[in-house]
UniProtKB/Swiss-Prot annotation:
Residues 29-87 form the TCP domain. The lineage of its organism: Eukaryota, Viridiplantae, Streptophyta, Embryophyta, Tracheophyta. It comes from the Eukaryota. It comes from Arabidopsis thaliana. One of its GO terms (biological process) is regulation of DNA-templated transcription. This is Transcription factor TCP10.
């Protein structure tokens, strides 16, 4: 241990290099003002102890028989060397950092289904296939039976009434998203009333499926498609008997035959009643179908009404199968001899006025 003298301040002094640091020993001044160099900078040589610690230290010094406190401190440090070394080792161990092994294995996507208090939360992985992602929207419990089969039970979905369920086989066009129906309006300048009452709602569902019907048989009544010539002949016969007919444009007769609107039993009494001899002249307009509507005079005696009411009611009986309003619209069909069943073949009274010409919407 060497000594090197340096002048420190005006009073001078020297720095004594000792084990564990340096001691600044002041010269020309009292020793209590000396400082020591430590790892955290110069500190006072003298250590101020609390009263309780000073009592215990002097008790140790007295037991050791030392006359100087520094000797008692050296003995304590020597006895505590093992503990001090452990503290130094402990400091080195605490400073060392342990690196945890990094798991580079990619995790497989997981699906979590949770349902609490009727609130369902689903977590779907972003890297799923479209088919797998579709399955995640339906929480299912899969059970395997003894035969190797798999049973999938769908749960936690509200059940709707079967009566309110409507099967949609085809997607309707955007302009037919509402309920389909015929809106009958008299032509401008015509003050005559409409035969059909306003309280009846002509609505129907699944209009697109009517075009697929190829034939319709009801009891002894058989209806098949006819040619264009037969259709024109039928129109002339219907004009003499009266009724309502919904037709396509004439140049489409060879492609699309006529379509007839069947009314329910309540509308039959108004339509076939001989007491209400109401006339409808003009053009019936429709806001949904590009068809031309014809109207002609309706004259029927009470005797003819009672004579042919049974035959007409048998044909209209099936209209209750297609809704509460009893309306059935058949496309792609022609109904030969229909007006004969409605008004009878022996109607002999001539019409008071001729039918108006066809008008296209």
């Amino acid at each position: 241990m060497g000594l090197k003298g340096y002048s420190v301040g005006e009073g001078g002094g020297e720095i004594v290099e000792v084990q564990g640091g340096h001691i600044i020993r002041a010269t020309g001044r009292k020793d209590r003002h000396s400082k020591v160099f430590t790892s955290k900078g110069p500190r006072d040589r003298r250590v101020r102890l609390s009263a309780h610690t000073a009592i215990q230290f002097y008790d140790v010094q007295d037991r050791l028989g030392y006359d100087r406190p520094s000797k008692a401190v050296d003995w304590l440090i020597k006895k505590a060397k093992t503990a001090i070394d452990k503290l130094e080792l402990g400091e080195t161990t605490t400073t060392t950092t342990r690196q945890e092994p990094v798991n580079t294995k990619p995790e497989s996507p997981t699906l979590v289904f949770q349902r609490e208090n009727n609130d369902q939360t689903q977590f779907v992985a972003a890297n799923l296939d479209p088919e797998d992602a579709m399955k995640t929207f339906f929480p299912a419990t899969t059970t395997t039976n003894g035969g190797g089969g798999t049973n999938i039970n769908f749960q936690n979905y509200p059940h709707q009434d079967d009566n309110n369920m409507v099967s949609r086989t085809t997607t309707p066009p955007p302009n037919l998203s509402q309920d389909l129906g015929l809106s009958l309006h008299p032509f401008q300048g015509n003050n005559n009333t409409v035969v059909v009452p306003e309280t009846n709602n002509f609505t129907t569902t699944h209009f697109d499926t009517f075009g697929r019907i190829s034939g319709w048989n009801h009891h002894d009544l058989t209806m098949t498609s006819s040619s264009s010539s037969e259709h024109q002949q039928q129109e002339q016969e219907e004009r003499s008997n009266g009724g309502f007919m919904v037709n396509h444009h004439p140049h489409h007769h060879h492609h699309q035959p006529s379509m007839m609107t069947l009314l329910n039993s309540q509308q039959q009494q108004v339509f076939l009643g001989g007491q209400q001899q109401q006339q409808q002249r003009g053009t019936l307009q429709s806001s949904l179908f590009p068809h031309s509507f014809r109207s002609w005079d309706h004259h029927q005696t009470t005797s003819d009404h009672h004579h042919h009411q049974n035959q007409a009611s048998s044909m209209f009986a099936s209209s209750s199968q297609y809704g509460s309003h009893g309306m059935m619209m058949m496309q792609g069909l022609s109904f030969p001899n229909t007006t004969r069943l409605l008004h009878g073949e022996e109607a002999t009274q001539p019409n008071s006025s001729s039918s108006p010409p066809n008008s296209h919407l």
